[in-house]
From Swiss-Prot:
Reactions it catalyzes: L,L-cystathionine + H2O = L-homocysteine + pyruvate + NH4(+); an S-substituted L-cysteine + H2O = a thiol + pyruvate + NH4(+)
Described purpose of this protein according to its UniProt entry: Catalyzes the cleavage of cystathionine to homocysteine, pyruvate and ammonia during methionine biosynthesis.
Alphabetic keyword roster: Amino-acid biosynthesis, Cytoplasm, Lyase, Methionine biosynthesis, Pyridoxal phosphate
The name this protein goes by in its record: Cystathionine beta-lyase
Enzyme class: lyase
Chief location of this protein within or outside the cell: cytoplasm
Self-association and partners: Homotetramer.
Annotated source species: Salmonella typhimurium (strain LT2 / SGSC1412 / ATCC 700720)
Subcellular location: Cytoplasm
Pfam families: Cys_Met_Meta_PP
Protein's pathway: Amino-acid biosynthesis; L-methionine biosynthesis via de novo pathway; L-homocysteine from L-cystathionine: step 1/1
GO cellular component: cytoplasm
Keyword Transmembrane: no
EC number(s) on file: 4.4.1.13
Gene name of the encoded protein: metC
Length: 395
């Protein structure tokens, strides 16, 4: 059997006997020093230190190699770099491909810390960044400069959930700037609902903190690269001291085993709740990529194989501070917290001017309070009842 279905891949990826040593899961190998029995063994390890050979703890142990192999199998990459969090994955992946005088082109709906890294850190190092509308499509060529080295996508966009026309964007970039490295924050799709490298994207980045871990109790970042970019990414990450502890690598691998079934439930529940919200009189708009009418829905339908549980909706009015507190402080099932991707439902709200402030060279087209929710694994009926009670508090 060569063409395995996703669930089968998730259960088995990275579980070869060299990593499990007779157990079901990969072993947890914690190490800094790794011992060589002979001079020849040390020479062999040195020659193969970048190819899954035990050399030094910062290069990885069996636990890391198991996860890296699994991620490459799932996303179709030549190699996978591991980082202590998603922000580290984004920052170090971008940094690997730019130098003084270069230009980055980034969607203006990218995660705010990704924007800040470019403007506040790389800006001081002589790297410039400009921004494009997430729905720009082939017109992205208008923003490409002779020194554009990185094109950074995030689809769906952070908070407002716009989906790119990725084939049009990639084709346009390849035509005008064939050497530019195209990378994507692929966290919403968990790297498996959108197969970025199959769309000629060079690097797929995830905050594995979200769906890969799946329980809101650890942080990890991954970057899966194609053959063109893997060696440069790998060595830059190593030289920057980027690494992941063995225990978190193990927890990430363990999270993969249930990722398929969790994502299906997140999708089913979030779509039911999104449809309920779309018909609620206090809701002006629902931003759910899998919901008809959401920005870029046709692109999601064409390019993605499913949906996760994160989306947002806009209220008919802008809540006052008192209303905001009454609304958010009294949910019984929705917890107010950043991040997402765990088994629990989360909620957080932003005023339109707050979103506009993190949309460089853009703005917002709504005036009501925006509410972002992550739909967890609780009963849909119970979650709807909790949301209904929230609406009753702000009538």
């Amino acid at each position: 059997m060569t063409d395995k279905q996703l669930d089968t891949k998730l259960v088995n990826a990275g579980r070869s006997k060299k990593y499990t040593l007779g157990s079901v899961n990969s072993v947890i190998q914690r190490a800094s020093s790794l011992v060589f029995d002979t001079v020849e063994a040390k020479k062999h390890a040195t020659r193969n230190l970048a190819n899954g050979e035990l050399f030094y703890g910062r290069r990885g142990t069996l636990t890391h190699f198991s996860l890296q192999e699994a991620m490459c199998e799932l996303e179709g990459g030549a190699g996978c770099a591991l980082f202590p969090c998603g922000a580290a994955a984004v920052a170090n992946t971008i940094l690997a491909f730019v130098e003084q005088g270069d230009h980055i082109l980034m969607t203006n709906t990218a995660y705010e810390p990704s924007q800040d890294f470019c403007s506040k850190i790389l800006g001081k190092l002589g790297v410039t960044t400009s921004w494009f509308d997430p729905l720009i499509g082939a017109d992205i060529t208008q923003h490409i400069q002779p020194n554009t080295k990185v094109v950074f996508l995030e689809s769906p966009g952070s908070i407002t959930m716009e989906v790119h026309d990725i084939p049009s964007i990639v084709s346009a970039v390849r035509r005008v700037a064939p050497e530019a490295v195209i990378m994507i924050d692929n966290t919403w799709a968990a790297g498996v609902l959108f197969k970025a490298l199959e769309f000629d994207i060079d690097i797929s980045i995830q905050a594995g903190t979200k769906y890969l871990i799946g329980h809101s109790d650890a942080m990890v970042g991954t970057a899966v690269a194609n053959a063109r970019c893997w060696e440069q990414l790998r060595e830059n990450a190593y030289l920057m001291g980027q690494m992941l502890d063995a225990d978190t690598a193990y927890m990430t691998s363990r999270g993969l085993r249930t990722l398929g079934v969790r994502l299906r439930q997140h999708q089913e529940s979030s779509l039911k709740i999104a449809a309920w919200l779309a018909n609620h009189p206090q809701v002006a708009r629902v931003n759910h990529p899998a919901l008809p009418g959401s920005k870029g829905h046709a692109f999601w339908k064409r390019d993605f194989t499913g949906s996760s549980g994160l989306f947002s909706f806009v209220l008919n009015k802008k809540l006052t501070e008192a209303e905001l507190s009454a609304y958010l402080d009294n949910f019984s099932l929705f917890s107010m917290a950043y991040s997402w991707g765990g088994y629990e439902s989360l909620i957080i709200a932003n005023q339109p001017e707050q979103i506009a402030a993190i949309r460089p060279a853009g703005g917002v087209d709504f005036t009501g309070t925006l509410v972002r929710v992550h739909i967890g694994l609780e009963s849909v009926d119970d979650l709807i009842a909790d949301l209904a009670a929230g609406f009753a508090r702000i009538v």
